[in-house]
């Protein structure tokens, strides 16, 4: 069985075609800057190809993707009939979805209803779903929700201390995100350790442009940093993460801001970008900090501290800690970020091997033999989990 997985952003499209009999990735790629100077990076047979191919819509991007999949020189597939189904990543399912579902018009309407809690993510997913249905009519489309993995979080941890009527009326509670990634990584670390997932207490640190931590006990999410929306939790590249709520109303009054303007500041102008004044790219900030830029150094320190603070908090949530696992763009590639985070956790016996951490590539242990907690780097594979 061959499954095509689509992950749509507001101006991007990530795709993978997976042979589920072997779980082999037959082809994958990323379409970037849809609507502008679009280009696609296509990977097949261990080779990478880049095409500058401007498109205005996700439908046009999917059409060109299918051309690449069918191109005889790559020998991927001969016909779209070989694709048995299409899986879509959907960020927010709120309390409307407790599992993956086959998509129909009713499902699309409910995904749209949830969009108020993840407007950029859910709207993009709907765009991709519509485009896929149009490009490949008759194929079953399945929605896989980031929020489903967090359905096991206990009530006292997902409930906010505001009047309960707002939960009853509007469903205001912690939902969590990156569930597909957290599920994959927590299962993968059990495989790597050769231990049953049911006995492990793990904190997964999904550190990318968007970032969240998840406390996983026995293979189930028991707490996570993101909340009602993907804005909560640790500071991110451009998102604020957790704040004193009064900051929002104080700034709105002082700056005469509308709710939409305030939301834009918190989502697009905050986090390490807001602190550093340099960039939303961790690599740029590290380069500036190395030159002596104090605000860049402040951004890195604040980021590392907050991640470590949540890991420490989750030791209580888990009743102990066996493993810390770093994943996603920053977690997998920024050794200095991992080092700074773990330095804050020395009081818990966390110790990394500096050489392994610095030289590390791909997947493996970076903690020292003396560390009381194992520290690993495991590349995430959300697409495989969606396909499964």
For the regions a protein language model found, what residue spans apply to each?
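Glycine-rich phosphate-binding loops at beta-strand->alpha-helix junctions
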Residues: 322-345
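Short glycine-rich, Thr/Ser-proximal phosphate-binding strand/loop in the N-terminal lobe
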Residues: 12-55, 227
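Adenine-nucleotide phosphate-binding core of ATP-dependent small-molecule kinases
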Residues: 264, 271-275, 282-317
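Phosphate/pyrophosphate-binding loops at sites that engage ATP/ADP/AMP, CoA/4′-phosphopantetheine
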Residues: 68-83, 189-196, 311-322
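Glycine-rich phosphate-binding loop of actin/hexokinase-like ATP-binding domains
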Residues: 149-253
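Glycine-rich beta-strand-to-loop/alpha-helix junction loops that act as flexible
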Residues: 9, 88-91, 207, 325-333
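Short beta-strand-loop/turn "lid" adjacent to the catalytic site in phosphate-handling enzymes
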Residues: 69, 73-121, 142, 148-157
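Glycine-rich phosphate-binding/hydrolytic loop that grips phosphoryl groups
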Residues: 353, 357-388
């Amino acid at each position: 069985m061959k499954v095509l997985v689509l992950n749509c952003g507001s101006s991007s499209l990530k795709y993978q075609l997976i042979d589920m009999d072997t779980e082999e990735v037959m082809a994958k790629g990323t379409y970037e800057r849809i609507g502008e100077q679009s280009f696609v990076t296509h990977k097949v047979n261990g080779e990478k190809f880049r095409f500058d191919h401007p498109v205005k819509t996700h439908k046009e991007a999917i059409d060109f993707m299918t051309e690449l999949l069918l191109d005889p020189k790559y020998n991927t597939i001969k016909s779209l009939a070989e694709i048995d189904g299409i899986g879509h990543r959907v960020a927010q399912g709120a309390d409307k979805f407790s599992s993956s579902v086959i998509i129909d018009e009713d499902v699309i309407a409910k995904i749209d209803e949830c969009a108020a809690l993840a407007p950029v993510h859910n709207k993009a997913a709907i765009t991709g779903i519509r485009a896929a249905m149009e490009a490949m009519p008759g194929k079953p489309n399945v929605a896989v929700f980031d929020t489903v993995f967090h359905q096991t979080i206990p009530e006292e941890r997902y409930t906010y201390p505001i009047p309960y009527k707002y939960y009853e009326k509007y469903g205001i509670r912690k939902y969590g995100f990156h569930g597909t990634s957290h599920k994959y990584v927590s299962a993968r670390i059990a495989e790597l350790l050769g231990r049953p997932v049911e006995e492990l207490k793990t904190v997964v640190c999904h550190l990318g442009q968007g970032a969240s931590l998840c406390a996983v006990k026995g293979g189930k999410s028991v707490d996570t940093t993101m909340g009602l929306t993907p804005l909560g939790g640790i500071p991110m590249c451009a998102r604020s993460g957790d704040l004193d709520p009064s900051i929002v109303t104080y700034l709105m009054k002082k700056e005469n801001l509308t709710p939409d303007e305030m939301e834009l500041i918190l989502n697009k102008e905050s986090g390490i970008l807001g602190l550093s004044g340099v960039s939303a790219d961790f690599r740029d900030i590290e380069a500036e900090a190395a030159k002596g830029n104090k605000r860049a150094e402040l951004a890195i320190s604040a980021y590392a501290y907050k991640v470590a603070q949540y890991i420490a908090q989750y030791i209580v949530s888990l009743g102990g800690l066996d493993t810390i696992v770093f994943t996603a763009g920053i977690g997998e590639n920024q050794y200095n970020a991992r080092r700074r985070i773990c330095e804050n956790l020395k009081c818990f016996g966390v110790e990394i091997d500096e050489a392994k951490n610095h030289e590390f590539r791909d997947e493996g242990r970076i903690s020292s033999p003396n560390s009381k907690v194992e520290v690993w780097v495991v590349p995430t594979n959300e697409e495989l989990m969606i396909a499964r």
